[in-house]
Amino acid sequence: MPKHEFSVDMTCEGCSNAVTRVLNKLGGVQFDIDLPNKKVCINSEHSVDTLLETLGKTGKAVSYLGPK
């Protein structure tokens, strides 16, 4: 399963909870949230575009850092 790393502008636990909510709703993903470094690593067969769109639903600034 491909692993991707994203930068997400998270500042608190509420932000990381929002990321957890949207990714769990998408399904088919395993992920780790690194709140201090504002990064999310996702293992998923979903496309990068789908993952970006899903993370964008949190209302936070999101960018794709590349494969991990």
From Swiss-Prot:
GO CC, alphabetical: cytosol
InterPro entries recorded: Copper_transport_ATOX1-like (IPR051881), Heavy-metal-associated_CS (IPR017969), HMA_dom (IPR006121), HMA_dom_sf (IPR036163)
Binding-site residues, Cu cation: 12, 15
A matching Pfam family: HMA
Domain HMA, first and last residues per copy: 1-63
Role: Binds and deliver cytosolic copper to the copper ATPase proteins. May be important in cellular antioxidant defense.
UniProt-recorded name of the protein: Copper transport protein ATOX1
